[in-house]
Design a protein with these regions (language model features):
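Short, positively charged
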Residues: 1-259
Length: 259
C-alpha cells in the first residue's frame, strides 16, 4: 500500500484510502452538495510589484512577446473560480467536511487549459492534489456538460477583437442568466455591464493580461455547464469531482494519506 504525503500545518491526519469494503460502501451513499460558486469579475489593478517581479523573472507577454505582463495601473481580473462543496459526513471523511475547489489556468502567466484542485477547509495547507483533467472531462461528458463547455483554450478569444460582436453578446447572456439565478457570486457591486467591461479591458494586449481574461471565459463556461444541470445532477457531479481529485474509488489502488 502506498503513502501519500501532503504539506501540512501543525497537526497531521492519517486516512486509509481504497482499503476496506466499508470505505467503498460509504462512497456509494455519500451525496455532497454545491454550497456556493465564486468567480469575481471586479476590476483589479496591475501593481508595480507584479510588473517588477515579472521583469526580474524574464517573463514576456505571451500574446505580444513584449517584456513584462501588462502595464502598471491597467485592469486585470482575479485568476480563479472557487467552488465550495459540502459533505454531510456519511462519506469517507467520516465527518462533516467542506471542500474548497480552486479552478484556474495551468499557467498563471500564459494561455492554458483549466485545472481543478480541492483543499479541505481547515486543512488549507494540505492540497488533495489536482483532479486528473481527462477524468474531469469524462465526468462532464457523462453529465452532458460538454454541450456548454470547450476544454481547449485555443478556441477562446485572446484579444479585444475576438471578444466582441456575437461572442461578447453570448457571454453577456450567460453571465446575466447565472447572475439573475444567483448561482454565481461575481463580486461586490458587479453587474453584467461592469463584468463585460472588465473582461474587455483585461483583453487589452498591450496594457492588460489577455491570458487571464481568456481563462476567465473558460471558467465562466464551466460554471454555465454546471448551472445547466439539475440540482441532483449537480450534487452528483460535485461528489464525483471530489472523489476523483482524492483518487478515491475502485479504479485506484489502496494507499494511506497523511495531510
Amino acid at each position: 500500500m502506498g503513502i501519500s504525503l501532503k504539506k501540512i500545518g501543525n497537526k497531521a491526519t492519517y486516512k486509509e484510502i481504497n482499503v476496506t469494503g466499508k470505505f467503498f460502501r460509504n462512497m456509494q451513499v455519500t451525496h455532497m452538495t454545491l454550497k456556493s460558486a465564486r468567480c469575481e469579475l471586479g476590476a483589479k489593478k496591475i501593481t508595480e510589484k507584479q510588473i517588477a517581479d515579472a521583469l526580474a523573472r524574464g517573463k514576456e507577454n505571451p500574446r505580444t512577446g513584449l517584456p513584462g505582463l501588462g502595464k502598471v495601473g491597467a485592469v486585470t481580473l482575479s485568476q480563479d473560480t472557487v467552488l465550495m462543496i459540502f459533505d454531510p459526513g456519511i462519506g469517507p471523511e467520516g465527518k462533516k467536511t467542506t471542500y474548497k475547489v480552486q479552478i484556474k489556468g495551468n499557467n498563471s502567466t500564459g494561455f492554458s487549459n483549466l485545472k481543478w484542485e480541492p483543499t479541505i477547509v481547515g486543512k488549507s495547507s494540505a492540497r488533495m492534489g489536482k483532479a486528473t483533467v481527462a477524468l474531469v472531462l469524462d465526468l462532464m461528458k457523462v453529465y452532458g456538460m460538454m454541450k456548454y463547455y470547450e476544454p481547449d483554450n485555443k478556441v477562446f478569444p485572446d484579444d479585444q477583437t475576438d471578444f466582441s460582436g456575437k461572442v461578447l453578446t453570448e457571454y453577456k447572456t450567460i453571465i446575466k442568466e447565472m447572475m439573475d439565478a444567483r448561482f454565481v457570486n461575481f463580486g461586490p457591486g458587479v453587474d453584467v455591464e461592469t463584468a463585460i467591461i472588465n473582461i474587455r479591458e483585461t483583453f487589452n494586449i498591450y496594457r492588460g493580461q489577455p491570458w487571464v481574461a481568456s481563462s476567465k471565459l473558460q471558467q465562466i463556461r464551466f460554471l454555465y455547464s454546471l448551472f445547466k444541470l439539475s440540482p441532483q445532477e449537480r450534487s452528483d457531479f460535485c461528489t464525483s469531482l471530489i472523489f476523483t481529485a482524492g483518487k478515491e474509488g475502485k479504479r485506484y489502488g489502496p494507499y494511506g494519506k497523511i495531510f
